[in-house]
Amino acid sequence: MEKFTPSELCADIKIYDYKKKVKYDEKSLVIFEKTGKMITAGKECEGMLYTLPANSIGFSPIVLGRVSDYTCAEKMLKQMLYRYLGKASFTGYGEGLIFIHEKLNEVEMKAYFDLLYQAGAKNVVYADESVKGIPEGTPWEDVIWGMKNTYKNLRFAVEITKEQPMDYFRYSLAELAENCKRWGLEEEMLKLYI
């Protein structure tokens, strides 16, 4: 299978601070020492991925919009929320919104609920592109900012998206080709794409 870099596969994460009315752009990237200690998380990892020390590993805990490594995703999200929202109070950060662009099953949704709770949310609201009552063509960023009108206690939102969806497409095709080869369906796959 074609090799993909962690930055090609990682989700783009946007953190909305309703209190300050600011949006922060991040990447689902982490760098860990092989001992398990996290060195850093987010977009600052991009430049470091190609010059990692021998005792470090860089990867994405959220791939194709799905949590692929729960423990690392939790540590990453905690660090990002701390970076942008400050230290959580005794009762946490308050109510948080998780907005996902990928279609998820119930187990995958539960992983995101748990991630936000573990990262410090007191309560979690889930939303995706199936939100009713949104005028067609409304930018998703406006929808997320507007959620504060519906959920008055929202303190922050986390949007999981992909700015370059072609990377996901290429990866999905390569994975399909690999599976077809494993299943003995290479000819059938070629017929589909020729």
Where are these regions (language model features)?
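Nucleotide/phosphate-binding catalytic cleft detector across ATP-hydrolyzing
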Residues: 1-25, 32-37, 45-194
